[in-house]
């Protein structure tokens, strides 16, 4: 019998949970070094620029043309943070800072607002909502998803089964590249 419990937590807390054997597996986007935890790259996904359907942005947009005061900011990964700091400074004024996507869709209805987000989420919003994906030059790097697990993972063959099914599923998503 297998029981699946899913908890959302920051990457560093996921590492501690795996290291302390409070969790068998973690899926993270910000890798760290922990002696007793393996970090395995699984897949990567492009981050895209998304705005409301009526926003004035056009394809070929440059980050230097953007006003961070119109941004709905979510810190997707460390590489995204470096890109963002490069273009907008270390402490830019943003319209809204979120730590999850619950309010993201509604906030994109505000005038001239924009957000950077994973391509799969952007595609869903563009297909089902009044949103658009706009191509951006010099955009952020792909976001990598990693599996983290205890060094003694061979004790849990279900982890390998789960990861194989996960990769088979996400491998069919056009915006995702398996690693």
Question: Which residue stretches match the model-derived regions?
Answer:
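Short secondary-structure boundary segments
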Residues: 30-31, 53-54, 76-78, 119-121
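Central regulatory/effector-binding core of bacterial HTH transcription factors
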Residues: 1-34, 98
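Flexible hinge/capping segments at coil-to-helix
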Residues: 36-75
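Short hydrophobic/charged patches on amphipathic alpha-helices used for structural packing
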Residues: 15, 19, 39, 63, ...
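Beta-alpha-beta core module
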Residues: 34-41, 45, 103-152
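Conserved functional loop/turn residues at catalytic and ligand-binding sites
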Residues: 17, 21-22, 41, 70, ...
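Secondary-structure junction motif
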Residues: 57, 67-91, 155-159, 163, ...
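A late-sequence structural motif
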Residues: 135-176
């Amino acid at each position: 019998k297998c029981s699946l419990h899913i908890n959302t937590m920051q990457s560093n807390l996921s590492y501690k949970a795996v290291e302390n054997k409070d969790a068998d597996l973690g899926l993270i986007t910000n890798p760290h070094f922990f002696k007793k935890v393996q970090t395995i790259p699984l897949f990567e996904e492009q981050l895209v620029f998304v705005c409301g359907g009526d926003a004035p942005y056009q394809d070929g947009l440059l980050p230097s043309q953007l006003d961070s005061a119109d941004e709905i900011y979510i810190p997707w990964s460390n590489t995204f943070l470096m890109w963002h700091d490069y273009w907008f400074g270390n402490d830019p004024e943003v319209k809204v800072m979120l730590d999850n996507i619950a309010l993201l869709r509604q906030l994109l209805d505000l005038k001239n607002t924009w957000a950077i987000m994973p391509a799969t989420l952007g595609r869903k919003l563009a297909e089902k909502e009044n949103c658009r994906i706009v191509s951006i030059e010099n955009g952020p790097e792909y976001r990598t998803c990693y599996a983290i697990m205890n060094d003694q993972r061979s004790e849990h063959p279900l982890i390998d089964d789960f990861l194989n099914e996960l990769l088979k599923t996400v491998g069919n998503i056009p915006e995702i590249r398996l690693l």
